[in-house]
């Protein structure tokens, strides 16, 4: 009875609300036929759809019964999720039995070096197909999986057009080496090192070409990739044509407008003048520096950005030759003026089949060309702090050499060029508009990717297959930056830089696979293979200024040049064995041996085994009478993976570097250089990760509810880290060593619910939750802490630290003391060691920037031709050091400089700190804020149509129109602009292992999009 109440109530509610719409067809004058639909066991099927001539005419009720208007003899089609469609001629009283859809049950999932039946997987593997009807503004492939997969956290680097993302699967596995997952695109394993203009491997593929994502999360699934699988694997399969299908042309395009979602709260011109008058007096020299304008600098640097995306596809197939061709263009303006991203992509895929389908080819080719115009992001911080009483431009002669832009200037030194009588005050902020306009920073990047897969099912030995894959990727990136001599950042000489980077990776893999079913209820397959990989990088740069006047006019100033190259090889042997008994008990074992050129003799080879067991409990005899359980499978897995990324190619032997500084010339002012030895370690070896995983897959009530739960523990040892060494013991104060251990323990779950499936209504809700707890178990030597997370206050101003026993991303701060009203007392922190002296020993570990809890929720509701969807994402328990709050903690900072003024925020008046040279004023837990959030990534409303313009010789036009809002809202307690802080650094250097410092990145915009999909 509970089962009936659960299903019947929502159906009645929707019938009541939408009864008129659902009953219109009841007035049609046709004959009435009745029937009953059940499954093979005799259980009634509720929610089966009945169609005639392509039109839905009914749906079964709670008892599997239906009544429809149809002429006897009319062909009816009955469909139900998870079962094979059934066609039957209409008659007075029908009893229809539906069978399980073997194709769906045996749906294959792409895994490492092969495919597997989804129902037979023993590892933690999630496969999804992008939801074409419920997605927001998508520029890169990572946008399609954000918040969609349990255990996968995607944080975009910024809101800059074409920017990349930080992807972490189950929290990452390293402190210093790479935490990026391995990306595999159509069998080609990509490297994670980009070139100028390419943010990451996911930016190299057109999102509209993607057929599916498969994410391998535990070591039993990833160990087949050995040294590259420690951080998980994301396998991308692109779309293909279908054999024997007619040519089909389709178009998908959209236009969007993006705006700034939130501005930093700062004083306007009138408020600022009032504050300066209050602090210093209206007759003071500081007040005299103020202007008469009321400039909102943030609104001067931002704009409404218009973007568009267009894709054309042709696909089809001859009898033995499926094909697909596509071309795409993305043009995206950034909300920060002058920024722009353009990308052109093309792809071709053909899949010829020969020799009675024994010999199959999969040939892929992809091309991408990207252009970037980078805005000077320093303008963002300067727009917050620049004096709002000053104008953007001025006709005053003192600003002539600044192209008329107002700046804080001073008299140039007597020895300086007399034709440049004024120069910018070095410590003062810069006019943010001039920073943007003076900077022309562009990149051009090309990427060519392709592979040829050959699969041969050997004649006479059909159980034996030979598979080979020849693949390669070549990229070239060129970046040119020209800064005008009137720029406040490169005054007088200007700045010119030319930067070129190239890379390629070649990959060859071959394996033999043997399949055998025997004794009717046992299956065995074994695979063994070899892989060879070569990655090479090379490039150069040249930067200089130009003398604008005088005897050296036109000559280069302070020119620096450099060339570099690097390469490494990886040779591997691997194998996998699968055994199943009674299609119920499954065992999988893998082994891989990797040999890397990055390690010395004796350490080159790493060995990575795994094993997993699966049990389909629902296939047991004692479960046969429990009809409410459609699937119940237990999984257990163990495996070992490795790591060699993020350490460079030559750190195990002695190398020398040519310095670029003029003081290194030999002899003094000569043409020679003194080469500097680099630190090295011949004992480097593989970083290894061991993972244990237990999981449950389930489906209830004929797949109305389905999901999975996984519990895991992962421990990484021999961490590759830059560890301190004793003085004079090497050629630096730090050297890469194998030291330390790291643990991740977690639980993740996903759930899909289909509460409504009627003739006109379909509703699907998908959610996921992840809990991950990490801990640094051991560090180098005596466990000395490793500080990081600079907040820009000079030596020692790091707000984060790695320490044994603490989670990654821990803040290392002083404990703030408050008054009775909860207001922080300036300079009063807890003396934790009670020695009367405040120093680093009084800092403590407080919270973490990494959220232990992650949530994702997607919903798609469809009514006839209409669809409505949204995606939510939440992060709970993550904290952020609010650097902006720290920087504006005192209103007195507005006049702290000599000859210039700076703006501030209303917050500064609330805290009202005084000027101080004590670093611990700023390094307190007061500035570490709870940054938990709930975000709505997108809301979409669409309408699908078909048979438009249908004619005698034309089947008509089908398609969909839709409207989407992206990055719609954020609910958070965090005071900053955005609680989602990435690990990217403002200077573009190597990101920290965990974000946590709010550096006022390029803001993520709110975007409104109109799109159309057409099938001709």
For each of these PLM feature ranges, what is it?
Residues 2-368, 376-377, 420, 424, ...:
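Short, small/polar-rich motifs associated with maturation and membrane association
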Residues 142-146, 734-743, 783-811, 845-856, ...:
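C-terminal extracellular loops and terminal segments
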Residues 31, 37-38, 60, 183, ...:
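Hydrophobic alpha-helical segments, especially N-terminal targeting/anchoring helices
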Residues 50, 78, 183, 579, ...:
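Short aromatic-centered micro-motifs
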Residues 848-881:
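Glycine-rich, aromatic-lined ligand/substrate-binding cores of catalytic
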